[in-house]
From Swiss-Prot:
Organism whose genome encodes this protein: Methanococcoides burtonii (strain DSM 6242 / NBRC 107633 / OCM 468 / ACE-M)
Catalytic residues, chain numbering: 108
Family note: Belongs to the ketol-acid reductoisomerase family.
Stated name of the protein: Ketol-acid reductoisomerase (NADP(+))
Keyword Magnesium: yes
Amino acids binding substrate: 252
List of residues binding Mg(2+) 2: 191, 227, 231
Length: 335
């Protein structure tokens, strides 16, 4: 059984008296920075000059500097920028301001694991990764709770990197729910696999293909949308709350029998083999190299694929149907 760490296992004193620079103020940046600040820690935000987030961070009560100035001022530098720009920003603006004994913090291991960033050996390098979107990281913290998270130590120059990671996780609020110790390799490879095979790639392809099959068979696109996309949230919520067991218990006998007998015919051995191929590309660095090159071409392929996604019939139909359901916007705004 994996070991869990909680509030009692972490001491914020490991970060007291240190300046923490959070680079970026997006989904995770705004949440983690505010939580750290509200936990009594000294936080500054690093942003590029002219960033639209600058005023937002100041309005939230945080001190804002350029990335370079924040790196020079800080003892602990947390990089919460998009994966594809981290390396460039690190070498041009962050590394020149670092000193021996400083700590470098990530919430995703991509750039460390795939050697896009190779830190000096005199730095501590650790990870604090909340397993939740930023708005929930912030909301649950304000409610007195927290979201589960991961910690990992890549480099322990000081001998205190684990204590620092636990303190950082406590400041973010993750030790209230519990954190698991992992490695940069394990976090990166499992995270990418989940995104590609299940959460983003697999689900999106399943929705589009099943929608296309129904429409090609002569069913109304609106009916196909409701059955293959809209109702998915109802099922996912049940799984999220109580696992597959709660979902099977909650649906009709017809749905349970059909799902258990037909599901394995859809996601079959051929699908399993494709998953292993995807995992191998992640493990051997092939996907990382492809993604880095994609970033160097200003995301030409990604931009083209995004356009095709927007034009897919399930999106065209869905946009019209969602306009009939104003409560969906209310739910998004609440989050």
């Amino acid at each position: 059984m994996v070991e869990m760490f909680y509030d009692k296992d972490a001491d914020l004193g490991a970060l007291k008296g240190k300046i923490i620079a959070v680079m970026g103020y997006g989904s995770q940046g705004h949440a983690q920075a505010q939580n750290l600040h509200d936990s009594g820690l000294d936080v500054v935000i690093g942003l590029r000059e002219g960033s639209r987030r600058w005023k937002q961070a100041e309005d939230d009560g945080l001190k804002v500097m350029t990335v370079a100035d924040a790196a020079k001022a800080a003892d602990v530098v947390q990089i919460l920028l998009p994966d594809e720009i981290q390396s460039k920003v690190y070498y041009s603006e962050i590394e020149p301001g670092l000193e021996a004994g400083n700590s470098l913090v990530f919430s995703h291991g991509f750039n460390i694991h795939y050697n896009q960033i190779v830190p000096s050996k005199d730095l501590d390098v650790y990870m604090v990764a909340p397993k939740s979107p930023g708005h929930l990281v912030r909301r649950t913290y304000k409610e007195g709770a927290g979201v589960p998270g991961l910690i990992a130590v890549y480099q322990d120059a000081s001998g205190n990197a684990l204590e620092m990671a636990l303190a950082h996780a406590k400041g973010v609020g993750c030790t209230r729910a519990g954190v698991i110790e992992t490695t940069f390799r394990e976090e990166t490879e499992t995270d990418l696999f989940g995104e590609q095979v299940d959460l983003c790639g697999g689900v999106a392809s399943l929705i589009k293909t099943s929608f296309e099959v129904l429409v090609e068979a002569g069913y109304q696109p609106e009916m196909a949308y409701f059955e293959t996309l809209h109702e998915l949230k109802l099922i996912v919520d049940l799984i999220h709350e109580g696992g597959l067991e709660k979902m099977w218990y909650s649906v009709s006998n017809t749905a349970e029998y059909g799902g258990l007998t037909v599901g394995p015919q859809i996601i079959n051995e051929e699908s399993r083999e494709a998953m292993y191929v995807a995992l191998e590309r992640i493990q051997n660095g092939e996907f990382a190299r492809e993604f880095v090159l994609e970033g160097q071409t200003n995301h030409a392929v990604l931009t083209s694929m995004e356009r095709l996604e927007k034009e897919h019939p399930v999106e065209v139909v869905g946009k019209k149907l969602r306009a009939m359901m104003p409560w969906l916007n209310s739910e998004l705004n609440e989050e």
